[in-house]
């Protein structure tokens, strides 16, 4: 199979939405029957984002094969059916690490290792490998043109443009076309300078996607075309919209997919965007609203919980309600108590690391349990629910996780020292293991208890979900917790690790050690999130009676 490559760059400012634009184009091409994948090349020196602060970088998206990747891969999976893997995201740090490892082994036969050709060759190899088996591979280059960190990646795609030729490569550049209120017009000069910068390193863009708060007038499109040496039909206006799921239709209406298909000489059907039209209709026509309190520690940057935010919205679509997320700092819960948890239709406690704010999350779980409020715990959210139950129901005062208190008399949550990975291999860890790349990661089979809310949600006796954690329920206390009324509704493939818990005599109190948000999509939703929002809606109706 001959793969075509679309390289996506950004200029003028960061955070223009390259990932959304790339994913939206991929969605249109997929709707035309093409097999599409997307890659993200990140210019930072970290090997992967696994140890980066969520408040700096946003969430870490975990793929099926256990790669810790950029949050843009979450956008990719939500827009197209292709599942991402570790080949879809790599960083400068990972490239340098692999090249230096080869140098130490003597693979370069004593050559002087340089950015060109050794680093650029390594980048090109990964891009080509990632695109294998697909009709089209869209490659997003992180950062902004002009950044020193991005230069090796830009040089690599320049070389690929020459080596593969125009019939197999296309360069798409996102820029900002701001509107100046004082002048009453949009300004194209930033775009002109950005394209000039890109051309100075040997890349001439074939398509310009111009971001702005409004549509770009035809005369300004013509001006951009003239000064940037791009066909006028290839100047695409991408205005702000109230839903990212409207962007595929917006790009389709301007013929971007036709331009790509013609450039590559591909024969395929017209795009069928009916699924996306249905998503947009559901989003615009809710029958009600629920308020979900998300009790976390990284709430100053909502992108730290990007997939959770989107999964809640997807569940709202399936339940025909809009979901309003109220972000609650877990430290505020510690300081002010239950008053900050009033007026909610449900509580969700997402994953997290470190001791800061953990007691606030425990209080949130207690509030939901005692007030029959729907509760959904994810990863740490499951652990704090179990700790709260152990302390206040099972009679284990001062129960805790050894992550936060190594001297606790009841270590109901402890470090996983051994487990079976997705390929059936035995993995082992200990306290001195590195932080990076040492967690239980990736898709794992989970056996569900017959008759449980989990089994009802999944409509079966098993599920496969993605993990990212070091700590698990301590099996020593399972029997005591069960006797107190806790239900262990999900177990690992070897049935040795607890994956899900529920509570008896509660409308909806469900928590999982895994991260179901990573597999939720706007078209398909996710059974656990759908069940949670349905329970929140039912709770609201009971309160109104």
Swiss-Prot record:
Pfam families, A to Z: CTP_synth_N (PF06418), GATase (PF00117)
Active site feature: 379 (nucleophile), 515, 517
PROSITE patterns: GATASE_TYPE_1
GO biological process, one term: 'de novo' CTP biosynthetic process
Domain Glutamine amidotransferase type-1: 291-542
Positions bound to ATP: 15-20, 72, 239-241
A single cellular component GO annotation: cytosol
Annotated EC: 6.3.4.2
Location of region: Amidoligase domain: 1-266
Protein biosynthesis in keyword set: no
Residues binding CTP: 14, 147-149, 187-192, 223
Binding site for UTP: 14, 187-192, 223
Keyword terms, alphabetized: ATP-binding, Glutamine amidotransferase, Ligase, Magnesium, Metal-binding, Nucleotide-binding, Pyrimidine biosynthesis
CDD domains: CTPS_N, GATase1_CTP_Synthase
Function noted in UniProt: Catalyzes the ATP-dependent amination of UTP to CTP with either L-glutamine or ammonia as the source of nitrogen. Regulates intracellular CTP levels through interactions with the four ribonucleotide triphosphates.
Subunit note: Homotetramer.
Name recorded for this polypeptide: CTP synthase
Organism: Shewanella baltica (strain OS223)
Classification of source organism: Bacteria, Pseudomonadati, Pseudomonadota, Gammaproteobacteria, Alteromonadales
């Amino acid at each position: 199979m001959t793969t075509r490559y679309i390289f996506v760059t950004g200029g003028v400012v960061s955070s223009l939405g390259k990932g959304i634009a790339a994913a939206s184009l991929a969605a249109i091409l997929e709707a035309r029957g093409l097999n599409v994948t997307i890659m993200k090349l990140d210019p930072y020196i970290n090997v992967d984002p696994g140890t980066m602060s969520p408040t700096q970088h946003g969430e870490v998206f975990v793929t099926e094969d256990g790669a810790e990747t950029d949050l843009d891969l979450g956008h990719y999976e939500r827009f197209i059916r292709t599942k991402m893997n570790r080949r879809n995201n790599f960083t400068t740090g990972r490239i340098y690490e692999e090249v230096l490892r080869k140098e130490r082994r003597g693979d370069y036969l004593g050559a002087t290792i340089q950015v060109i050709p050794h680093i650029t060759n390594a980048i090109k190899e990964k891009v080509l490998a990632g695109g294998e088996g697909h009709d089209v591979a869209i490659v997003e280059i992180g950062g902004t043109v002009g950044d020193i960190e991005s230069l090796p990646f830009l040089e690599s795609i320049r070389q690929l443009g020459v080596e593969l030729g125009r019939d197999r490569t296309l360069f798409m550049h996102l820029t900002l076309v701001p509107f100046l209120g004082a002048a009453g017009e949009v300004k194209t000069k930033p775009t002109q300078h950005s394209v000039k910068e890109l051309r100075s390193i040997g890349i001439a863009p074939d398509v310009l996607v111009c971001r702005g708060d409004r549509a770009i007038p035809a005369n300004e499109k013509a001006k951009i075309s003239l000064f940037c040496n791009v066909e006028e039909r290839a100047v695409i206006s991408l205005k702000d919209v109230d839903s990212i799921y409207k962007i595929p239709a917006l790009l389709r209406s301007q013929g971007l997919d036709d331009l790509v298909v013609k450039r590559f000489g591909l024969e395929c059907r017209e795009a069928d965007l009916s699924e996306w039209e249905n998503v947009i209709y559901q989003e615009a026509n809710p029958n009600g609203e629920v308020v979900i309190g998300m009790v976390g520690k990284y709430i100053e940057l909502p992108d730290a919980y990007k997939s959770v935010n989107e999964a809640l919205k997807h569940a709202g679509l399936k339940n025909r309600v809009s979901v309003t997320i109220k972000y609650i700092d877990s430290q505020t819960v510690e300081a002010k108590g239950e008053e900050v948890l009033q007026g909610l239709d449900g509580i969700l406690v997402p994953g997290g690391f470190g001791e800061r704010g953990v007691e606030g999350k425990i209080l949130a779980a207690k509030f939901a349990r005692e007030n029959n409020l729907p509760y959904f715990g994810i990863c740490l959210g499951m652990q704090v629910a179990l700790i709260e139950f152990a302390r206040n129901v099972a009679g284990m005062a001062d129960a805790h996780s050894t992550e936060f208190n190594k001297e606790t008399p009841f270590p109901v949550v402890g470090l996983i020292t051994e487990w079976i990975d997705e390929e059936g291999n035995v993995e082992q860890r200990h306290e001195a293991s590195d932080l990076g790349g040492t967690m239980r990661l990736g898709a794992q089979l989970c056996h569900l208890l017959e008759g449980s809310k989990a089994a009802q949600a999944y409509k079966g006796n098993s599920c496969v979900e993605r993990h990212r954690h070091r700590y698990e329920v301590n099996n020593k206390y399972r029997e005591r917790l069960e006797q107190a009324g806790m239900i262990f509704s999900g177990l690992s493939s070897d049935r040795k690790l607890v994956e899900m818990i529920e509570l008896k005599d509660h409308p909806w109190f469900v928590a999982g050690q895994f991260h179901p948000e990573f597999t939720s999509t706007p078209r398909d939703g996710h059974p656990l999130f759908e069940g949670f929002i349905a329970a929140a809606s039912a709770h609201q109706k009971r309160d109104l009676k």
